[in-house]
């Protein structure tokens, strides 16, 4: 087995002390010799870390000691080397920028669907009520180009702030369908699903844990290609191992200072 544990995780929870928390988490990460990115905002936390398993687990255990983070459930994968160059801890306006202040996931989220349930729906061609199921990719266009669910809806957005106007332009196409929004790890599709509900779409779900959790808990069926990740691995396949990108696919910054799929 490879020696380096990579985790990604987020939690929408009020963090009025985000600035002070930044200093605390930076010190902890440095003491454990971890590398990656931690983003904090008043709406929550979003982080991507890599290092020896014991160090990574120690960091997560310390986070869970704070009641606000007690239920953190990081997604895990392994690599031979650390795919980040440094440790960044930043305070942002949003942990995933949508520029839509009425969307507050900490106050309530849209229903979610498990990876196993989505796989079953896609296999049978409809949900449990017989309604047509469509998947909606909420990532940026170049991420979609690296891999996506078969026949997914892709609005070719270049940043997440373009999602709300794209939804308004295409909302009628989603009526009477069961829509499952998805993204890399769940954070974008959580906001997207809430917005779709607010816009009057009734049968909307988010894919719990995103593509990475789908890979972790299923065989990756109905997904073509890899999942773009914002570190030196570039992309991972259904087995969560590194998979090559096509040469024509653009290279984004290795370690973003904004969340995956930069806003």
From Swiss-Prot:
It comes from Delftia acidovorans (strain DSM 14801 / SPH-1). It catalyses: uridine(34) in tRNA + AH2 + O2 = 5-hydroxyuridine(34) in tRNA + A + H2O. Keywords: Oxidoreductase, tRNA processing. This is tRNA uridine(34) hydroxylase. The gene is trhO. The active site is at 183 (cysteine persulfide intermediate). Transmembrane segments: none annotated. Gene3D superfamilies: 3.30.70.100, Rhodanese-like domain. It holds the Pfam family Rhodanese. InterPro entries: Rhodanese-like_dom, Rhodanese-like_dom_sf, TrhO, TRHO_N. GO terms for molecular function: oxidoreductase activity, acting on paired donors, with incorporation or reduction of molecular oxygen. PANTHER family: RHODANESE-LIKE DOMAIN-CONTAINING PROTEIN 7-RELATED (PTHR43268:SF3), THIOSULFATE SULFURTRANSFERASE/RHODANESE-LIKE DOMAIN-CONTAINING PROTEIN 2 (PTHR43268). Its EC number is 1.14.-.-. Belongs to the TrhO family. The keyword Oxidoreductase applies. Catalyzes oxygen-dependent 5-hydroxyuridine (ho5U) modification at position 34 in tRNAs. Residues 129-223 form the Rhodanese domain. One of its GO terms (biological process) is tRNA modification. It is an enzyme of class 1 (oxidoreductase).
């Amino acid at each position: 087995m490879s020696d380096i544990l990579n985790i990604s995780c987020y939690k929408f929870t009020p963090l009025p002390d985000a600035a002070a928390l930044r200093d605390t988490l930076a010190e902890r990460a440095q003491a454990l010799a971890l590398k990656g990115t931690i983003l904090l905002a008043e709406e929550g936390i979003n982080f991507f870390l890599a290092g020896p398993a014991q160090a990574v687990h120690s960091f997560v255990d310390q986070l869970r000691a704070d009641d606000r983070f007690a239920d953190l459930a990081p997604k895990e994968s392994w690599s031979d080397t650390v795919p980040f160059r440094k440790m960044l801890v930043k305070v942002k306006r949003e942990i995933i920028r949508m520029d839509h202040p009425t969307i507050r996931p900490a106050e309530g989220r849209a229903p979610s669907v498990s990876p196993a349930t989505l796989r079953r729906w896609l296999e049978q061609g409809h949900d449990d009520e017989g309604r047509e199921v469509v998947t909606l990719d909420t990532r940026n266009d170049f991420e979609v180009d690296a891999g996506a669910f078969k026949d997914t809806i892709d609005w070719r957005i270049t940043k997440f702030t373009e999602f709300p106007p794209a939804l308004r332009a295409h909302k009628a196409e989603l009526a009477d369908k069961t829509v499952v929004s998805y993204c890399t790890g769940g954070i974008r599709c959580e906001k997207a699903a809430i917005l779709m509900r607010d816009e009057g779409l009734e049968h909307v779900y988010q894919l719990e844990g995103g593509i990475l959790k789908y890979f972790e808990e299923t065989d990756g069926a109905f997904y073509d290609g890899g999942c773009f990740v914002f570190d030196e691995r570039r992309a991972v396949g259904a087995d969560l191992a590194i998979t090559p990108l096509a040469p024509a696919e653009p290279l984004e910054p290795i370690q973003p200072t904004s969340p995956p799929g930069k806003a």
